[in-house]
């Protein structure tokens, strides 16, 4: 039997790869897991009641485009958060998790050719792995652009050659960045949107960590498109309740963009999508409408930022994250450091290069480990102290 080759060169996914590295070795102490970005804070206490009140919806097919209540809740959040008025019926699509949207947007919106050539999809490097798979799925060439200390931990897309830029169809950007915690400034967004206008490509803006920050809410792509008066089709915004509301298991994400782009996403969903079940759409509608639990959740992370700064502030090369809940810590060799932490003190982290691709012999992240600050704060502090004392 013949199988397609388009995904044959994909490296092993980060977490199975980590298990291969560590699981044959006993931890040096009671394990403290700081690998996956799965929030451990409590989700809102009203969630079970909303599911129960809407349980009859499990017997019905859910609407592909989302209930009117969910669409209105998302539009209201976009207006409050970014000051941008969007049409709930034509500019919003609820997603069954943001990863679905980030993947399907490339299928729905990336053209087969750009200027008569194979299209290019740009992605930061390191990056959320779905970006590259989406590019391969549509026959585009993924181009991995370093996002390192030298570039402010965001990709410098303008530095690419004219040959590459004229073929760009889609650009992925993550702000706040996973894994580095860097935030795109208004100036960065303006430059990127200007580049997109000049070379006629779309920006897929992954902003799933936008509600976890220190002091100032990160600027968003949709907000800047509106301020600049750019083409509203230029950007598709993606966000989620996973981090904002500690509802990773709900699988509720959103795509917000121009009517033409959203119409194409909806058309694909009608043929091949899996909408969120009705009772879960009811939970999502309430979550997008409520900011009290988000503010309380952010305060917990702000405490964690302060704890991390206190414990690691004396470590050479430590850079406090601007937002998100990952630490991106410098080490000599990521796998060696990861193994040392596990075998000596039972702290489990992720080698940075597991989230990156090698380009011209260089793999961004090879000198870093990613540490998730998702555990209860005392457990997190204990893990960071062990990490500091073991590695530094």
Positions of predicted regions on the chain:
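Glycine-rich loop-to-alpha-helix module at the N-terminal edge of alpha/beta enzyme cores
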Residues: 34, 58-60, 73-76
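A short, structured active-site edge motif that brings together acidic residues
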Residues: 61-66
